[in-house]
Amino acid sequence: TSIYVDMNQTVQVVRDGDGGHDTLKDINEIYGSDYGDTFKGNGNDTLRGLAGNDTFYSGGGSNLYDGGADNDLFIITSSTQGQDSLIGDTGNDTVDFSKVTDLVSPTKGLEITLNGNEEVISKLNGVDSHKLKGIENVTGTIYNDTIQGDSNNNILSGFGGHNTLIGGAGDDTLVGGTGTDVASYETSTSGIKVDLTQINFQVTDDGLGGRDKLSGIDTIVGSDYADTFKGGTNSDTFIGGLGDNWFIGSAGNDYFEGGTGSDTVDYSAAITNLVVDINDGSKYINSYYGTDTFKNIDGIVGGSGDDTLIGNSGRNTLIGGSGNDTLLGYGGDDYIDGGSGSDFVSFAYTAKNIKLDLAITDVQNTNDGNLTIKSIENIAGGAGNDTIYGNDSNNTLRGGYGNDTLVGRGGNNYLIGGLNGYQIVLGAIVLGTTYSFALEGKTVSYVAQNGDTKASVLKALENSFNANNITNSYIVNDGEKLYMSDGSEKIYIL
């Protein structure tokens, strides 16, 4: 059976596994049994566990503990007991620092980087502590620890404090403790994939060829490559690195922070109407998705609802999805794709003189940045003097404030001016096209007939306004331009 060795006592005692108690004198090296032995060192002792799952407790002096075969546990009980050498040998071996509570004014707790069968030195509060070799697993202290694994399948546990755990290669298990704990992948050589909804491995690709299990982790720091992060039901923090990162929204109150690349938040699974604003510090609040907070985010992917997506002054990518979406780039050189549905691009935030042509799908200078638009049917201008052109679809063009020019082109278009007057350019007269205009709250319509010209359409509209008893308006038709005003609103139809 197993033996028990305590070298800390004045009379060193061994329970020999056969029911006897042996007293040792001037003995410095002990070999254990093939079973689960327990050793407590003191002085410059050499204690070897051989086979079995052995347990070693650190003591005074500089001892050598050799676990031998099987899965051994080395427990460090103090920071002042000397520099022991801990050899895991074969098996899956663990060093436990959780009983170290005597650091004086610590600014750091445990610092250690495992390296397989190569000897490494741990530090406690910046001071060399123990020598480790052949150790796979580490449990930290009550202080703020930094624990890094190697190419083996490591189990790294934070215990107390605010800890940083770095798994390295292999299929690792990273366990947070009572503080705020970080799983860091800054040493990965390719992008990582994180999905906290998974049961077995929450990091399905650690960027080093392995997969990791996460428990009690509050923050995940990505690599310098293109990472993918998906949250779970808890409140998680995801921090991207230098690559182009993808953050997938889910339940829980999450914090998404991009890096220096092009970083995107993805709500494509959402079926409710979203309002997402990626200006730094902005919060997106939704009954299902919770409250998400953004920093250094460049792009948004909406869901199947009628979403409002709000960019920032940087280079944004806004993708609406399948609903009827409203997209606001907020300046910068943006790419905006409305997706399916009837989508608006809005410039309501600016007083610049916007010039935009929906028929142009390549980049165009809008006076508010170089904009590329896809699958956009509708435009809302701002407070400037805007010039807005439609395309062959059914467009809604809103002028906003300012003296605006709205050009519908083909399709059945809805052109809405602003308070300071606007021009509506008819373009070519198309047989069967319906022309509708509103003044004094009354709407008139005319369907183009065979042989109509611009002048005949203008005359028909003039007659329709007069026939609808629009008596408080001033209407002038010179054959080239129909001018109407009710005192507050002015319309020019060219």
Regions found by a protein language model. Give the residues of each.
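Glycine-centered beta-turn/loop sites at beta-strand termini
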Residues: 1, 7, 17, 32, ...
